[in-house]
Design a protein with these regions (language model features):
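Active-site mouth loops of central-metabolism enzymes
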Residues: 19-30, 92-107
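Active-site beta-loop-alpha junctions enriched in small/polar residues
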Residues: 21-23, 52, 87-91, 127-130
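N-terminal binding-site loop/beta-alpha segment at the start of enzyme catalytic domains
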Residues: 1-82
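Conserved catalytic core of Hanks-type protein kinase domains
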Residues: 39, 87, 116
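Generic beta-strand or strand-like secondary-structure segments
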Residues: 68-72, 83, 87, 105-112
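A short acidic, helix-capping loop that chelates divalent metal ions and anchors anionic groups
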Residues: 53-57, 91-96, 133-134
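Glycine/proline-rich, positively charged
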Residues: 95-138
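Short beta-strand segments at enzyme active-site cores
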Residues: 46-50, 83-86, 121-127
Length: 138
């Protein structure tokens, strides 16, 4: 496995990132755990998730991907072996429909991420979709 260093973190991260957006929709919790075991065994230590996963977004399944990851961290104790990235989302079924990225909303989202992930920190936190006047990319 090839690695790069994240300057602000000083962490060595794999050039391949484990994406998780289907866990809870196309993959079961057991499947997710097996994929995390395999990824780490192959040296993939950079993992990405988001509060809105699984995809496509569904208010009844929202957060399942992070919950699966959190149960794996609790079971294995390997949270510190992973560089974890997650994201705040703007889905209108989250936080009572508040889709603004203000301090209060970001804090509420982050607290929920941490609870589902069963961890006290997320290494990289991102805005899943920027606030913009149009729904088009670009």
């Amino acid at each position: 496995m090839q690695f790069d260093t994240l300057p602000q973190l000083g962490d060595s991260v794999s050039k391949i990132c484990l994406g998780t957006m289907t866990w809870g929709q196309q993959n079961s919790e057991q499947d997710a755990h097996e994929q995390m075991d395999y990824a780490l065994a192959q040296g993939v230590n950079f993992w990405d998730t988001a509060e809105m996963y699984p995809s496509p977004p569904d208010k009844d399944k929202q957060g399942d991907t992070e919950r699966f990851m959190g149960s794996w961290f609790a079971k294995t104790g390997k949270r510190n072996d992973v560089v974890l990235a997650s994201k705040i989302s703007r889905n209108d079924f989250l936080r009572g429909g508040n889709t603004k990225f203000d301090k209060k909303t970001i804090r509420a989202a982050l607290d929920s991420n941490l609870q589902r992930l069963q961890t006290d920190h997320i290494d990289i936190y991102q805005l899943h979709w920027p606030e913009r006047q149009t729904n088009f990319f670009g």
